[in-house]
């Protein structure tokens, strides 16, 4: 099988089988899998993702589309830098070596990529365009720098996004995260929050789960900003944001974030306050707030109620108010908010109910002075109007989404093209001096960014005044590169950032395939970038991905030895119901079935399994055992079964090719109907990504043809036609063996160039159908009925079946439930 696979991979390469032109006379289809990080080896999770995309690409080609199916590398990132530190090498050497190795792995799997369009994000010829684009955005004031409180990883010595902090620790290093103020560069994604939110509903071919996640991440809240005067400091106020201002008479405290400016201005920091602030600083995202026990500490300050000067409210630093949402301050209404209630109970604060029901059971305001009797919506508008009349508040909209911090304090990334001059201030690098490339002579003898300490690269002359200046030593967040790469595939040799003519033809991406873990960062940033690129006339679209498919993960059992060390599956052998170490024969504990990961070693080596079976067998298994959107559990017996199926096809060819047409002595109409039925439904299944169901249908057709061969009287012509069709249907899934059999069947045209089989509508109606026969809901038999039979006849036949009579034992059934053409359930 390996020789066959190598043969066809060589032919495809020589014939430039998957090299596609920008031919606008043809209907286009752009299918794209998320580009991988070149970590060293392709894993089975990657293979599932790419196999799904390859089925779609090959199928759409056979449907007559001009298909763009490219591949590239998301090549910047921290792992390369860490590898350089560990191995005393250069990140670029490690990265390019991995790319070369992983590319060979992908080619060995027979994926139909147009490798002439390959991109590499660490190539200066790629990232020079994003440096120029950054400067264009800077000129439009869509880029700015400010001092910001950041999550600092003291081990990796870099800033982490909130999403990269898990339970207060760095997602890679595991170090406890510190809070620091650093100058950071930001992109104004919040300028586009409303459009990003509104257009989600137009993404009809995206999973609902992803759309909801993006909506929640953007997090639009409509309410009011208003001010509370601080008692004894009545020239000072605390501004709060509220989505429920109608509950203002139920307020019992003001909650502020641990880093609210008022703390530095007016509050005397006791040890209790200082310790609480330190504790709060470890909470980095709102998802952690929900899990945290609600706590607070009194500041010593009070504010005056805006509508009743006799009501004085304490100001409390809380662990559930964030400075980067709203104003960093809220008024707490414990009777009508779960978090406020939890804190009020703990701190013995008043709990005043201000919403009740009237005699019609409609919610109305109570205990609220001039708001009493109004509905919540009426009261809300009246309160906001009152704030505006008094000049202490105004209507406002807040978003959970914050501007995108793009600065990273690492070497292996795209340099930010900015120069700092004592005379001229911030100076953009002139376009003619792009790209700003990374130096080759760097030292990784400590964990600090080597750009910061480089003796020559950092020091330059100012482009404006020619005096001494220094470069920006931060690099771009690596999401910067992956936010526009899909546009570069349209023409990766374009002089500018994009080839607008090619982009107009290919974009948007028709189907984008990748993991749901990218729902709110990569996918949101890519949508944002597309809008920016549209405004700069690089692309004509404002949404990058017409369709999105999120595949499930590949799972495997985990194993540990007696010393609690993780073991690879290849190191473990099963004996009965127990597991043992292959070399030491010591007992091994099987743990949970989890996502394959290097850290827990529950990974399958691609080359080992490929050598044992074949690329086609791997492709078939990762597509057949579970719906593509669901998780897949790796199974040795499963891939073994797929390998047997492929060998069965080869054996069937040997038998079928020996059959002579003059041996035809039986017309099998039902087999012919099944062939046309399979053509139609396999095509439909591929279009809806029901790939496991498509494979099941093709297995059914395979078995039907195999059974026909075994009969004394056979329909040779239908068998040969059906086998030809079967090989064609299977080609997008297992391309190597099907190309081989197709050629041996005498077909002159390459299979990858052929037109997908067409079905005859008139052949789709079957003269019989099979029904399941149940007794008390349990399957006891099946029976094949003619399509023209009545329901009464169906019931009569089923109760008289020998297997059913055994359960009836001479009695009459109490009831017969019939689901037409599917199930008969006999109740006794």
Swiss-Prot record:
Which stretch carries the motif 'KMSKS' region? 595-599
Binding residues for ATP: 598
Among the record's GO biological process terms, what is one?
leucyl-tRNA aminoacylation
The UniProt keywords, alphabetically, are:
Aminoacyl-tRNA synthetase, ATP-binding, Cytoplasm, Ligase, Nucleotide-binding, Protein biosynthesis
Q: Which reaction does it catalyse?
A: tRNA(Leu) + L-leucine + ATP = L-leucyl-tRNA(Leu) + AMP + diphosphate
Gene Ontology MF, one: leucine-tRNA ligase activity
What's the domain of life for this entry? Bacteria
Task: Say where the protein is mainly found.
Answer: cytoplasm
Q: Supply the NCBIfam families for this chain.
A: leuS_bact (TIGR00396)
UniProt lists the family membership as follows: Belongs to the class-I aminoacyl-tRNA synthetase family.
This protein is called what? Leucine--tRNA ligase
Lineage in the entry? Bacteria, Pseudomonadati, Pseudomonadota, Alphaproteobacteria, Rickettsiales
Gene name of the record = leuS
């Amino acid at each position: 099988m390996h020789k066959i696979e190598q043969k066809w991979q060589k032919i495809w390469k020589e014939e430039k089988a998957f090299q596609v032109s920008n031919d606008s006379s043809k209907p286009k289809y752009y299918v794209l899998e998320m580009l991988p990080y070149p970590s060293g080896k392709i894993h089975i999770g990657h293979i599932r993702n790419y196999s799904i995309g390859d089925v779609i690409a090959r199928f759409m080609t056979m449907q007559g589309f001009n298909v763009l199916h490219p591949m590239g590398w998301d090549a910047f990132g921290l792992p390369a830098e860490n590898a350089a530190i560990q191995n005393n090498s250069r990140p670029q050497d490690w990265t390019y070596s991995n790319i070369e190795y992983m590319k060979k792995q992908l080619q060995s799997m027979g994926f139909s990529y147009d490798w002439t369009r390959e991109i590499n994000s660490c190539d200066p010829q790629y990232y020079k365009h994003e440096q120029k684009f950054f400067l264009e955005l800077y000129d439009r004031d869509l880029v700015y720098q400010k001092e910001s409180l950041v999550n600092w990883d003291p081990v990796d010595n870099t800033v982490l996004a909130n999403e990269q902090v898990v339970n207060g620790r760095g997602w890679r290093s595991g170090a406890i995260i510190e809070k620091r103020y650093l100058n950071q560069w930001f992109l104004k994604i919040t300028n586009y929050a409303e459009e990003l939110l509104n257009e989600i509903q137009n993404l009809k071919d995206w999973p609902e789960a992803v759309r909801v996640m993006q909506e929640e991440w953007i997090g639009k809240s409509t309410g009011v900003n208003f001010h509370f005067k601080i008692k004894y400091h009545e020239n000072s106020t605390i501004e709060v944001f509220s989505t429920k201002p109608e509950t203002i008479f139920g307020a019992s405290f003001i909650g502020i974030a641990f880093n609210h400016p008022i703390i530095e201005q007016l509050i005397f920091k006791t040890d209790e306050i200082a310790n609480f602030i330190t504790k709060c600083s470890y909470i980095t995202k709102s998802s952690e707030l929900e899990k945290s026990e609600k706590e607070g500490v009194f500041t010593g300050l009070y504010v005056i109620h805006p509508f009743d000067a006799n009501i004085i409210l304490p100001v409390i630093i809380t662990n559930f108010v964030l400075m980067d949402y709203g104003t960093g301050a809220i008024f707490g209404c414990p009777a009508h908010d779960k978090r406020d209630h939890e804190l009020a109970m703990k701190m013995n604060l008043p709990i005043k109910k201000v919403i009740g029901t009237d005699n019609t059971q409609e919610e109305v305001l109570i205990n609220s002075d001039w708001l009493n009797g109004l509905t919540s919506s009426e009261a809300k508008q009246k309160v906001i109007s009152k704030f505006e009349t008094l000049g202490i508040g105004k209507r406002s909209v807040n978003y959970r989404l914050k501007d995108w911090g793009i600065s990273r304090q690492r070497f292996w990334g795209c340099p930010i093209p900015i120069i700092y001059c004592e005379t001229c201030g911030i100076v953009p690098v002139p376009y003619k001096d792009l790209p700003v490339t990374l130096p080759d002579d760097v030292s990784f003898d400590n964990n600090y960014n080597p750009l910061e300490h480089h003796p020559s690269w950092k020091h330059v002359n100012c482009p404006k005044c020619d005096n001494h200046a220094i470069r920006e030593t931060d690099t771009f967040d690596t999401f910067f590169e992956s936010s526009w790469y899909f546009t570069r595939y349209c023409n990766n040799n374009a002089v500018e950032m994009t080839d607008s003519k090619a982009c107009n033809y290919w974009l948007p991406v028709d189907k984008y395939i990748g993991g749901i873990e990218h729902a709110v960062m990569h996918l949101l940033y890519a949508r944002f970038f597309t809008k920016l690129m549209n405004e700069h006339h690089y692309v004509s679209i404002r949404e990058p991905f017409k369709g999105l498919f999120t595949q499930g993960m590949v799972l495997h059992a985990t194993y540990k030895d007696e010393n609690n060390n993780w073991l690879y599956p290849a190191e473990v052998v099963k004996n009965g119901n127990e597991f043992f170490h292959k070399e030491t024969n010591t007992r091994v504990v099987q743990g949970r079935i989890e996502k394959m990961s290097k850290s827990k070693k529950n990974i399958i080596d691609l080359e080992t399994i490929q050598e044992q079976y074949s690329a086609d067998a791997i492709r078939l298994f990762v597509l057949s055992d579970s719906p593509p959107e669901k998780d897949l559990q790796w199974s040795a017996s499963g891939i073994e079964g797929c390998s047997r199926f492929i060998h069965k096809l080869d054996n069937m060819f040997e038998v079928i090719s020996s059959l002579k047409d003059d041996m035809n002595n039986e017309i099998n109409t039902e087999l012919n109907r099944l062939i046309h039925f399979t053509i139609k439904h396999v095509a439909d299944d591929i279009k809806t990504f029901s790939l496991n169901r498509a494979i099941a249908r093709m297995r059914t057709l395979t078995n039907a043809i195999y059974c026909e061969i075994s009969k004394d009287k056979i329909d040779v012509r239908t068998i040969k036609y059906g086998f030809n069709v079967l090989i064609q249907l299977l080609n997008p899934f297992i391309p190597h063996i099907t190309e081989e059999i197709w050629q041996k069947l005498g077909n002159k045209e390459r299979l990858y160039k052929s037109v997908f089989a067409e079905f005859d509508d008139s052949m789709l109606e079957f003269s019989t159908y099979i029904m399941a026969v149940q007794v008390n809901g349990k399957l006891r038999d099946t029976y094949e009925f003619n399509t023209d039979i009545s329901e009464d006849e169906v019931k009569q036949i089923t109760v008289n079946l020998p297997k059913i009579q055994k359960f009836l034992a001479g009695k009459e059934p109490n009831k017969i439930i019939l689901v037409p053409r599917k199930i008969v359930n006999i109740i006794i």
